[in-house]
């Protein structure tokens, strides 16, 4: 764990693990909604194939449900966009550290994903701070644990939220 000067650029933030993980979550949510919408669109047509009026009513019900589900998806997307905007707006206020990712745990919220706990020195006090659960071997995962386990990374510590954001691996 080495504290260093925060020379991170906005381009590095936009290419960071943290930023791209959130972008990937948004894409997964959109694809999931499109998949549900596409498959469920077939139901009104399959059920009411003999009546035009029933097809119209089925389509109206389908459309209402997709708006309802889309509202929840939209709230989640806004959450991720807000987190990325927060990072872009405040990254210069965070302390930069070079750490080794060697202590991991399984996330409860993101099943099958892992997060790392890093030990940093902040204002003279040692702290154990968690990253977000970026890493997984699942199909839709952008970052796999093998690429980062026991590797040195540069990250930013947000003392307000007590979070450690992984920016990039050190070569």
Please identify what each model-predicted range represents.
Residues 130-171:
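A membrane-cytosol interface segment of integral membrane proteins
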């Amino acid at each position: 764990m080495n504290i260093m000067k925060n020379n991170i650029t906005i381009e590095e933030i936009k290419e960071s693990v943290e930023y791209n993980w959130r972008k990937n979550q948004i894409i997964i949510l959109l694809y999931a909604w499109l998949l549900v919408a596409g498959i469920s669109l077939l139901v009104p047509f399959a059920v009411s194939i003999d009546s035009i009026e029933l097809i119209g009513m089925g389509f109206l019900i389908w459309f209402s449900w997709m708006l309802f589900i889309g509202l929840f998806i939209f709230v989640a997307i806004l959450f991720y966009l807000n987190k990325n905007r927060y990072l872009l707006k405040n990254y210069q206020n965070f302390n930069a550290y070079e750490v080794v990712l060697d202590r991991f745990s399984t996330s409860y919220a993101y099943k099958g994903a892992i997060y790392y706990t890093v030990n940093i020195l902040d204002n003279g006090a040692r702290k154990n701070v968690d990253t977000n659960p970026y890493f997984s071997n699942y199909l839709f995962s952008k970052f796999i644990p093998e690429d980062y386990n026991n590797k040195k990374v540069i990250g930013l510590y947000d003392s307000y939220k007590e979070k450690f954001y992984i920016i990039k691996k050190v070569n």
